[in-house]
Every structure is written in structure tokens, then in C-alpha cells.
A protein has these predicted regions:
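Short acidic, glycine-rich surface-loop motifs adjacent to enzyme active sites
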Residues: 127-138
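Glycine-rich phosphate/adenosyl-contacting loop at the front of the ribokinase-like
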Residues: 1-56, 63-66
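Conserved phosphate/ATP/ADP-binding segment of small-molecule kinases
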Residues: 147-233
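Conserved phosphate-binding/catalytic region of the ribokinase-like
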Residues: 201-309
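Charged helix-capping and loop-helix junction motifs
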Residues: 115-118, 143-150, 198-204, 238-243
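Conserved N-terminal subdomain of the carbohydrate kinase-like
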Residues: 24, 48-128, 298-309
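Gly/Ala-rich phosphate-binding loop of Rossmann-like dinucleotide-binding domains
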Residues: 47, 150, 154, 264
Length: 309
């Protein structure tokens, strides 16, 4: 089973407008409200792939109840820890070809609530083979929190796919307990090392830095150029076809879902890379975030190439 972790989930509200008028009333007929957060995007794609999974994290208040109801409606199993604070909202106003976002920072999670989550997390690990940890941490939680989760998972033989950024990522990979897979982009690699990465050769050299030692999989996503992957001591260039992009938001989360799914199915390294790229591409072809059409999987899969460097 795959356990997905979302510590800072949200209700994503989308308001489509022909024109946003300031300092007056804007009436909206078509409102979309979905359970949001990077880990929930991962979860939806895993569900569409028919992978056995369970979702965890922290939720609170009326919006937390709404979020779990949405997951129930999608038949996605979950086991969240409850907190006193209210789950956040993230509002996107779509207007004149642009998108204006209003993002709440989210609730503060107390030390007691963190301890309760960790206890629940340890229970869930008993039936888990892989864990995906995605996104930011809410207020009140230190940057080393994911390191604690990785340690708990590693101690039970469970492998962790980590998709976060900034100081949280840096702290997590500098710990003595390593994630099994990370999925940074070139900018995040440069930020981690404090230097520019401007070519494939520089990127390969960067991935040989001591900070990455002990991480089995490093999947550096390159947008339309595919990915550069380090698996163990080997490097691979993964190239993808040109496709029509409808909505790129959530593609990274969909890639994580594909990688986790393929790993859980004991696929070969090449199959893992290709599956991750395909699920990421499939997401870009849908209007909704964290959605794929599995019927189109095979046709794209055949067009992805993997070259060992």
C-alpha cells in the first residue's frame, strides 16, 4: 500500500470570471471547490491508477470536514489527525487569461497535535510499502519534521518519496535518515548548492555533491525537456514528446504518483521513469488539477525514451 502525507491541505476554490472588476461586486455562477494540497493531487492520481492507498495529514474545522467528505465522494480512503485550527482555503480567480491567487497560510499545529499525528503515522506504516510526503509544512511545525517521518518510515523498512522545497527539503536530505526518492527541479538544485546550474554536465556534477549521498533516486524534472535522473550511481536522460498542454498545475504531483505507483508494482528502473513522465504529461492534458485519463497512458508511454548516460 502507498501512504500519502499532506500536512498543509486546503480547499481549493476556483472563481472563473470574464473580467475582474475592482472595488465593486463580481457575481460568479460556476464555482469549483476541491480538496487541495500537493499530496491530495498525488492521491487522486494514484486512485485513478487503481493503486491501493490511504491518505493522511492534519485537518480541522468545517473546511476539514468538507475536505474529508470530498475524499469520501471520490472513494479515496483516509485517516487524518484532527487539529483545533481550521483547514485553509486557497482561492484562484481566473480572469482575462490570468490567474490571481489568494492563499491562506493555514492553521498552526501544536506540539501535542504533532505528537498525535506521528503516533497515527506510525500505526499506518504497519500496512505500508511506500510513503509520499508532499508540500509545505503548516505554522508551528519545524523544518526537521519530515526528517522525523522519514526516520520512522526507514526504521520499519518503508521507502519515502519526498517532494518539498526550500529549507524543509535541505533539512530533510541532510538528516542521517534519507528519503528513497526526491524530485527537485533545476532551480531547487541550484538553491540547495548555492550555485548556478546551466547545463546537463553541471547538473550531473551537482547531483554528485555530498548533500545527495544516500538518496537512491533523484528525479530532476525539466518541464518540456523531460528529466535527468540519477538512480544509484547511474544517470539517465528521459525525453518526452511534444504535447498539447491544457493545465500544467499539479503535473509534478502527478509525476510523484506515477513514480510511487511504478515502484510499488516492482517495475524496472526504465519503467519507473517512463511511468512518472507519462502521468505528469497526462495531468497537463486535463482542465482539473491532479486528474489523468488512464485511457491515454499507453500511447504516451510508447513515445517516452530513456537513455543511459
Amino acid at each position: 500500500m502507498i501512504l500519502t502525507v499532506t500536512m498543509n491541505p486546503s480547499i481549493d476554490v476556483s472563481y472563473p470570471l470574464k473580467q475582474l472588476k475592482l472595488d465593486t461586486v463580481n457575481r460568479i455562477a460556476d464555482v469549483s471547490k476541491t480538496a487541495g494540497g500537493k499530496g491530495l493531487n498525488v492521491s487522486r492520481v494514484l486512485s485513478q491508477l487503481k493503486a491501493p492507498l490511504i491518505v493522511t495529514g492534519v485537518v480541522g474545522g468545517h473546511l476539514g470536514d468538507y475536505l474529508t467528505t470530498q475524499l469520501d465522494n471520490d472513494r479515496i480512503p483516509h485517516n487524518f489527525s484532527k487539529i483545533k485550527g481550521e483547514t485553509r482555503s486557497c482561492i484562484a480567480i481566473l480572469h482575462e487569461g490570468s490567474q490571481t491567487e489568494i492563499l491562506e497560510s493555514g492553521p498552526e499545529v501544536s506540539e501535542e497535535e504533532q505528537a498525535e499525528f506521528i503516533e497515527n503515522f506510525e500505526q499506518l506504516l504497519r500496512d505500508t510499502d511506500f510513503v509520499t510526503i508532499s508540500g509545505s509544512l503548516p505554522k508551528g511545525i519545524d523544518n526537521d519534521f519530515y526528517s522525523v517521518l522519514i526516520e520512522k518510515a526507514n526504521q520499519t523498512g518503508v521507502k519515502v518519496l519526498l517532494d518539498t522545497s526550500g529549507e524543509t527539503l535541505k533539512t530533510s536530505i541532510q538528516s542521517s535518515f534519507k528519503p528513497y526518492l526526491i524530485k527537485p527541479n533545476e532551480t531547487e538544485i541550484a538553491d540547495l548548492l548555492g550555485k548556478d546550474v546551466n547545463s546537463e554536465k553541471e547538473l550531473i556534477n551537482a547531483l554528485d555533491d555530498d548533500i545527495f549521498h544516500g538518496i537512491e533516486w533523484i528525479v530532476v524534472t525539466l518541464g518540456a525537456d523531460g528529466a535527468l535522473v540519477k538512480k544509484g550511481k547511474d544517470y539517465y536522460r528521459v525525453q518526452i514528446p511534444i504535447i498539447n498542454v491544457v493545465n500544467p498545475v499539479g503535473s509534478g504531483d502527478s509525476t510523484i504518483a506515477g513514480l510511487a505507483y511504478a515502484l510499488s508494482e516492482n517495475k524496472t528502473s526504465e519503467e519507473v521513469m517512463k511511468t512518472g513522465m507519462v502521468t505528469g504529461m497526462l495531468n497537463t492534458q486535463e482542465e482539473k488539477t491532479g486528474f489523468i485519463n488512464p485511457d491515454h497512458f499507453d500511447s504516451l508511454y510508447e513515445k517516452v525514451t530513456v537513455e543511459r548516460l
